[in-house]
Design a protein with these regions (language model features):
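Enzyme catalytic cores with a strong preference for nitrogen-chemistry domains
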Residues: 1-188
């Protein structure tokens, strides 16, 4: 199986998550939600975390666990998302959004990082900002909130069918959804 995945390493080794069910390589956290619209065709090339869970007859939440990295001040616990995982309100599980941020926040992470290759489209950054605020606000009302970091690619890419441009617009969000810092677009 091929995964579109975040690979997490520390001191030259991929990080294991001991509580993780079998089925993934060390240090890997695959994309949970695959887009299949416009020029996206993830399911054609990759196996998603939802597909892995279904294939093993398990709940997808079993795989949405934090990574832990030792630091000089203690253990830093963080969660990862890939691109489409942010747009969770468009994907439901048991009639509720499949909110990986919420699951990670419930599991005591210190931060969540969304690593994206999200192409530029007109006013998409405003839509993304509203979506992040909505997700963080929903969790904050439950008394669960952590900072969120959106890290987007900059540049251009030819996928064989389309030429896509990526504007960056990396943004750090406070736990309440307000912007803490924002990088200049197109220059990262």
């Amino acid at each position: 199986r091929k995964y579109n995945a975040v690979m997490v390493a520390h001191d030259g080794r991929f990080l294991d998550r001991e509580q993780l069910p079998p089925g993934l390589p060390s240090g890997a956290h695959p994309k949970t939600l695959h887009p299949n619209y416009r020029f996206f065709d993830d399911d054609r090339h990759f196996f998603s975390l939802r597909q892995l869970a279904a294939a093993q007859g398990r709940d997808v939440a079993d795989w949405i666990l934090p990574f832990e990295v030792p630091t000089t001040t203690g253990i830093f616990r963080f969660g990862t998302q890939l691109c489409e995982d942010l747009w969770c309100d468009d994907y439901c599980l048991d009639s509720a959004p499949l909110d990986t941020y919420g699951l990670l926040a419930e599991r005591g992470v210190d931060a969540v990082f969304n690593l994206s290759a999200s192409p530029w489209t007109w006013q998409k950054n405003d839509k993304r900002h509203r979506t992040v605020q909505q997700i963080l606000s929903r969790q904050s009302k439950r008394g669960i909130s952590v900072p969120f970091f959106y890290v987007n690619q900059v540049g251009a890419q030819n996928n064989g069918k389309n030429i896509l441009v990526f504007d960056g617009d990396t943004t750090a969000y406070e736990a309440d959804g307000s912007r803490a810092a924002r990088a200049r677009a197109w220059t990262q």
